[in-house]
UniProtKB/Swiss-Prot annotation:
Catalysed reaction, written as an equation: ATP + H2O + cellular proteinSide 1 = ADP + phosphate + cellular proteinSide 2
PANTHER family (UniProt xref): CHLOROPLAST PROTEIN-TRANSPORTING ATPASE, SECA INNER MEMBRANE COMPONENT OF SEC PROTEIN SECRETION SYSTEM
One Pfam entry name: P-loop_SecA
Region Disordered, residue ranges: 788-822
Protein name in UniProt: Protein translocase subunit SecA
Organism: Shouchella clausii (strain KSM-K16)
Binding site for ATP: 86, 104-108, 493
Gene: secA
Length: 841
């Protein structure tokens, strides 16, 4: 449908690109004029542009001369004079879009000249990269252009002091990673003094490798968490039980969704093993959860593919980059289940103090732009969620890479044999080869096979990313064979060594199709940079995960009927189309999942914005007296309306309950009597009680200085808001975990989540008002009161891997007894534990 509409009305991004061609003509027309200027005159142009903006001009009014100035500065500082196509890319970024530029086309330079224009407003511009190495490298190389033109530059990275971060954010241009920006935002909304904040209002962000950050990591939440004490015995017991279960008989596993669930027989075994009547009883929720997570750890999570064990710890492997994500933990107890599975020490779970996804963080910027080599396949998502068009920028030189059709083998062994033979043949000629794998396991299989053939090679995967830049740099040299997991080394160009062009350039060999076409395109794009020669080809088998998930059984049966050998490939455009169709289906599923996550996240986003805005008002306010008085009035109104509703006659009102609450929470023991309340209308009751409460409040204030009282109120309010918000995050998270079950009752889970979430938020606000009122009236005003954090938090990145953003939940801790050696075994066999599953313990 979208394609048909485009044929009729045209692609808006391409229309804009044609308009931009005319603007580029104007920029190029100023080239000679800029060359005549001295360095000082060129620098003074920045002051001139800023003055025009202060007088009311817009960035669009000055974009042509500003780009011309930045272009000339790049030529003088770096000896890199931007091409015409790079100016087209810079304009796309200036307009808040995504510039899709092929590998080696100079995206970083494009971003630099576009950012110069945005930075002229003086509101702070963030250049976002995926890791600290790239942020530092770009600042050292390209940051000099900004400094040459009189702008300030800062680097924001992990481990800086508060003062260093404030200085970095105060600069005109700040280089940072996406993680650090998100964590700083969360930390800023947990500070106890406004002076402790580091970020300015979010103005403009330019995201490098935008698809990686806004698509691949969109569902991964950034979390500030605090540890919580929890017994870990149950993880071990669930792990011991799950080990004896049999597939299909006791549980089922769906490879498409990676979901595992117990069968009726499995449930019966669990009930016998743990000596309970009903596993699905409310009091066994925690046990059920532990069994399910342990089952997932054993069946759906694979060592050296989803995670590795290093130094006695389970370390997650990023499914998109193949890198180890140290410090990041699977949430919702899955990490603990993996620790139990691997026989490691089970660590404590944590409580969420603050959380945000990249989707919601980056949508808060006034203006957003991005660069990548592959975004067109996700154009719909960028437009619908972030309001950005993908503009495909032409290459400076035509692409000379040959993309060969896929080769499909019957078995995985046949495929790997063919891969190694092809590498051996190319290696004899001296032509460099880059082998792309989808996980650590595959890279090590290929590596072992090459070692047996005595072919020297480098392996670039999650286990040795420290040498990444060095390995990638040499990957284009004569005779180099490099095995890389997915897009390890992204952001670093592979340049051809001497004599390689004559051999045909770099050959990229993919050992498996990724579920996303974009990731495959990134791998292909490693060859043929800036018009270089090169080639690419994918080797597939009917046993590959993508093929298995989307019905390769018929094709495999056909190959067997034809009597095809394991090492005999099919090279057919029909098969390639089938693979692409499968990829489109997976991409569609993933987009739908991200869209659904965003719809649920939007509920929390709205609530978070309200809380953070009100918290900021508390921090900035010198006098909270009016706010406190309003909270007291609201509390009184609520108590009266609850116990004395107008729907009942006065004789049925519970005046005793009103008096008990008011005396216990807001006044002294005999502050108000039931007798005083009798015979009054609801409004009169509210007026009388409010008058008494406010009189007591003013009397308390008179006992201390006004300054002491105001600080006392601020401390109480910050502590209460932070504690209640922390609990609310947890409750909303628990609500979200089970909300999908409402669909069985013909209710829309999203609508139910919104409705119940709103009610819970309203209840939290009421609790804040009541608690603040109580503490202000009942607590003793202390001298030199110090503001303290409710809980000490640390930044963590839970993985989205099949968990979306399920954060660690706090549930009631129930006692789980140790299994004695002579007790019945938990597997339900009827034998003693010591003679069954505990025999080797």
């Amino acid at each position: 449908m979208l394609g048909l509409l485009r044929k009729i009305v045209g692609d808006p991004a391409q229309k804009q690109l044609k308009k931009n061609e005319k603007i580029v003509d104007q920029v190029e027309a100023l080239a000679d004029e800029m060359k005549q200027l001295s360095d000082e005159q060129l620098k003074n142009k920045t002051t001139e542009f800023k003055a025009k903006l202060e007088e009311g001009a817009s960035l669009n009014d000055i974009v042509v001369p500003a780009l011309a100035v930045a272009r000339e500065a790049a030529g003088r500082v770096l000896n890199e004079y931007p091409y015409r196509v790079q100016l087209l890319g810079a304009l796309a970024l200036h307009q808040g879009n995504i510039a899709e530029m092929k590998t080696g086309e100079g995206k970083t330079l494009v971003g630099t000249i576009a950012v110069y224009v945005q930075a002229l407003e003086g509101k702070g511009v963030h250049i976002v990269t995926v890791n600290n190495y790239l942020a530092r490298r770009d600042l050292e190389n390209y940051g000099r252009i900004f400094q040459f033109l009189g702008l300030t530059v800062g680097l924001n990275e992990n481990g800086l002091t508060r003062e260093e971060k404030q200085k970095a954010y105060a600069a005109d241009v700040t280089y940072s990673t996406n993680n650090e920006l998100g964590f700083d935002y969360l930390r800023d909304n947990m500070v106890l003094y406004k002076e402790q904040m580091v970020q300015r209002p979010l103005h403009f962000a330019l995201i490098d490798e935008v698809d990686s950050i806004l698509i691949d990591e969109a569902r991964t939440p950034l979390i500030i968490s605090g540890s919580v004490e929890r017994k870990t015995k149950l993880y071990g017991q669930a792990n011991t039980f799950v080990r004896v279960l049999k597939r299909d008989a006791d549980y089922t596993y769906d490879e498409k969704t990676k979901s595992v669930q117990l069968t009726d027989e499995g449930v019966n075994k669990a009930e016998r093993a743990f000596n309970i009547d009903n596993l699905y009883d409310q009091k066994h929720v925690q046990l059920n959860h532990h069994i399910n997570q342990s089952l997932k750890a054993h069946v759906a999570m694979h060592r050296d593919a989803d995670y590795v064990v290093e130094d006695g710890e389970v370390v997650i492997v990023d499914q998109f980059t193949g890198r180890l994500m140290k410090g990041r933990r699977y949430s919702d107890g899955l990490h603990q289940a993996l620790e139990a599975k691997e026989g490691l020490e089970v660590q404590r779970e944590s409580i969420t103090l603050a959380s945000i996804t990249f989707q919601n963080y980056f949508r808060m910027y006034q203006k957003l732009a991005g660069m990548t080599g592959t975004a067109k396949t996700e154009e719909e998502e960028f437009r619908n969620i972030y309001g950005m068009d993908v503009m495909v920028i032409p290459t400076n030189k035509p692409v000379a890479r040959e993309d060969r059709p896929d080769l499909i083998y019957k078995t995985m062994q046949g495929k790997f044999n063919a891969v190694v033979n092809e590498i051996a043949e190319l290696h004899k000629t001296g032509r460099p080869v880059l082998v792309g794998t989808v996980n650590v396991e595959t890279s090590e299989v290929v590596s072992k096979m090459l070692t047996r053939k005595r072919i020297p090679h480098h392996v670039l995967n999650a286990k040795n990313h420290e040498r990444e830049a060095e390995i990638i740099e040499k990957a284009g040299h004569k005779g180099a064979v490099t095995i890389a997991t997915n897009m390890a080394g992204r952001g670093t160009d592979i340049k051809l060594g001497p004599g390689v062009k004559e051999l045909g350039g770099l050959h990229v060999l993919g050992t498996e199709r990724h579920e996303s076409r974009r990731i495959d395109n990134q791998l292909r794009g490693r060859a043929g940079r800036q018009g270089d020669v090169g080639s690419s080809q994918f080797y597939l088998s009917m046993e590959d995960e993508l093929m298995r998930r989307f019905g390769s059984d018929n094709m495999k049966a056909m190959m067997e009927k034809l009597g095809m050998e394991d090492d005999q490939p099919i090279e057919s455009s029909l098969v390639s189309r089938a693979v692409e169709t499968a990829q489109k289906r997976v991409e569609g599923n993933n987009f739908d999942a991200r869209k659904q996550v965003l719809q649920f996240d939007d509920v929390m986003r709205e609530q978070r914005e309200i809380i953070y805005r009100q918290r900021m008002e508390v921090l900035e306010a010198d006098n909270l007296k009016t706010i406190v008085e309003n909270m007291m009035k609201a509390t009184v109104e609520r108590v009266v309306q609850t116990h004395c509703p107008e729907s009942l006659v006065q004789e049925e009102w519970d005046l005793a309950a009103v008096a008990t609450y008011i005396n216990g929470q807001l006044l002294s023991e005999n502050g108000i009597s039931e007798k005083e309340l009798k015979g009054k209308e609801q409004e009169e009751l509210i007026e009388l009680i409010t008058e008494k409460v406010l009189a007591a409040y003013h009397a308390k204030e008179a006992e201390v200085s006004s300054e002491q009282m105001r600080e006392f109120e601020k401390v109480i309010m910050l502590r209460t808001v932070d504690r209640k918000w922390m609990n609310h995050i947890d409750q909303m998270d628990q609500l979200r975990q089970g909300i999908h079950l409402r669909a069985y009752g013909q209710n829309d889970p999203l609508r139910e989540y919104r409705f119940e979430g709103f009610n819970m938020f309203e209840a939290m606000i009421a609790e804040i008002e009541e608690e603040v009122s109580m503490y202000v009236m009942k607590a003793q005003v202390q001298q030199n009161l110090k503001r303290e954090e409710v809980a000490e938090g640390k930044a963590v990145r839970p993985s989205a891997n099949g968990q979306e953003d399920k954060k660690a939940k706090r549930k009631p801790v129930r006692k789980a007894e140790n299994i004695g050696r002579n007790d019945p075994c938990i597997c339900g066999s009827g034998k003693k534990y010591k003679n069954c599953c505990g025999a080797n313990r």
